[in-house]
């Protein structure tokens, strides 16, 4: 365990409980910017729809997540929580939640060994062998919690599945699973036994769920929260539009205007990042594999290039794809002196950080590193290739996270209260009427007035006056 840890109880791992008062003040401010979550509390508090839910949460332990946790608890749930990224925790947020008695396992800058230990600990509900052992719900971001249980169950039957880790992180994760099985050979099966389902926050985690579902190996019901319109078209786009440059600026104090910035990927995240950089008068180039997205970027006025072409010309590089090996060793070797390299995709494999570990590293400040190449050229790597907006800043603004987390809360209620409506092993999205509900909850805060259809108008286009207003195939 990190030497800096001063836990409030044996069932908690945080940096410093004395930060709780600061965290509580920021939580109160965030609540005023999170109308969706607060309205959900008000609507469901009396009914307690999550009473009896034991939620294992793996999601960035930020101030905004603290509001989510307290919403889940207000609706009756019991919660255990860890961060889904070693750099994304806000220690004062973790302290504020720990002070309320919720088990929290999250420290900014925790080691990978601690990360996997903490992820194991979110499943430790109840006494062994009882009906209350383990969680009955998972709230995941990136899929690590879900993956851990599935891989652990496979390893119970065949340890050889842990024989060939593909990365340093997998090596540490696999070692943690081996150690757990040496202590308790049926731990993963027991912790999974009562799980009704999982709600997944982000693109990368949804990809993992879809892969398992297609192979027939997904053991739980799942709701894909990421593809709710009020998540992907808001958090991914508008959230990244504000938090990317916040991270770059806090880390480097660089002037964006006049720089050439490359955004790898032009999905919702890439679109938001490109808009932000252009708004600060950078010259923005985009790399893409998909001709539709590439054409979208070109029609918005961005120059569409390849990373090979751009590597020696640009000043700032941002990966947004959710894929691996986007910026490789040969790209970094070609870069200008003092080029800034960062990632805003969920995992750290978009930039081949392992390939430059052989060179000289100098930490400028936490999550900001100078890497010196053999020819003396230096690049600036942010957050060691992990999420720059959470590693070097504090993530998305509260308002946009209110929409994402209202979706999470509604998805948890859906799965927990209506399990028979969802088939084990399949991945679902929330009904459009609930997506529209989340949007409605946020309109007043931004001063928006919604026009109401007349009976004749509703009949003419064949929709209910209460919605949903668009077919499932509609792309916003």
From Swiss-Prot:
Cited NCBIfam families: ahcY (TIGR00936), PRK05476.2-3 (NF004005)
Pathway the protein contributes to: Amino-acid biosynthesis; L-homocysteine biosynthesis; L-homocysteine from S-adenosyl-L-homocysteine: step 1/1
InterPro entries per record: Adenosylhomocyst_ase-like_sf (IPR042172), Adenosylhomocysteinase-like (IPR000043), Ado_hCys_hydrolase_NAD-bd (IPR015878), NAD(P)-bd_dom_sf (IPR036291), S-Ado-L-homoCys_hydrolase_CS (IPR020082)
A cellular-component GO term for this protein: cytosol
Binding-site positions, substrate: 62, 141, 201, 231, 235
The protein's required cofactors: NAD(+)
EC number: 3.13.2.1
Catalyzed chemical reaction(s): S-adenosyl-L-homocysteine + H2O = L-homocysteine + adenosine
Protein name as catalogued: Adenosylhomocysteinase
Similarity annotation: Belongs to the adenosylhomocysteinase family.
Primary location: cytoplasm
Enzyme's top EC category: hydrolase
